[in-house]
Amino acid sequence: MGQKVNPIGLRVGVIRDWESRWFAEKDYATLLHEDIKIREYINVRLKDSAVAKVEIERAANRVNVTIHTAKPGMVIGKGGTEVEALRKALNQLTGKRVHINILEVKRADLNAKLVGENIARQLENRVSFRRAQKQVIQRAMRAGAKGIKTQVSGRLGGADIARAESYSEGTVPLHTLRADIDYAAVEADTTYGKLGVKVWIYRGEVLPTKKKASEEGGK
């Protein structure tokens, strides 16, 4: 059976950048686990704040954390109280000085993680898996997606035998490296157990700007 590689990992270094940007020789494993802890803590603490991505940069004894969210107001809190409490908690967790930046995700319907969380939330509220998928597909296409594919797998509708059902619209060219494809895998906790939710969103092609610039210089 043909298996699919993670579309984000395949495009890192081609059209996507790393989400952790730092260099280490001896402490690599320690810092990697620290990154995982930071991301897990943020995702649990800001579960309802529509966090799309957490980027981490390091310099000496300082950690710069950039949180991409569709609800910046909830993350920052009244007068910045929430973000300050989060910063103190991360300082304690890492033992380093943590600086937090908040960036707003303008189009949540074109972000695979947020779309996946939307489907998962609906499944947890006993909405039909077919309806949940079709609804987010329509919204993504209206928001300007070139193509979208969703898949829900597990004990669908409480069935005894687990299965997977997927829906798609438009095109999702997984082999085209210049295609900007966002991907996410999310879990939904239902009364019948966990359901897996996968989302692929094709947002258009990313043109190789570096090559163009060099060509123009040559002319």
Curated annotation (Swiss-Prot):
UniProt superkingdom: Bacteria
Instruction: Tell me the PROSITE patterns matching this sequence.
Output: KH_TYPE_2, RIBOSOMAL_S3
Domain KH type-2, residue spans: 38-106
Signal peptide from the UniProt entry: none
Identify one Pfam family in the record.
KH_2
Identify the keywords attached in UniProt to this record, alphabetized. Ribonucleoprotein, Ribosomal protein, RNA-binding, rRNA-binding
GO terms, biological process: translation
Q: Which Gene3D superfamilies match?
A: 3.30.300.20, Ribosomal protein S3, C-terminal domain
GO CC entries: cytosolic small ribosomal subunit
A GO MF annotation of the entry reads:
rRNA binding
- Asked if the Swiss-Prot or TrEMBL record annotates the protein with the keyword Flavoprotein, the reply is no
Subunit and interaction comment: Part of the 30S ribosomal subunit. Forms a tight complex with proteins S10 and S14.
Record family assignment: Belongs to the universal ribosomal protein uS3 family.
UniProt-listed NCBIfam families: rpsC_bact
Give the function comment from the record: Binds the lower part of the 30S subunit head. Binds mRNA in the 70S ribosome, positioning it for translation.
Q: What is this protein called?
A: Small ribosomal subunit protein uS3
Instruction: Look up and give the organism this protein is from.
Output: Bacillus cereus (strain ATCC 14579 / DSM 31 / CCUG 7414 / JCM 2152 / NBRC 15305 / NCIMB 9373 / NCTC 2599 / NRRL B-3711)
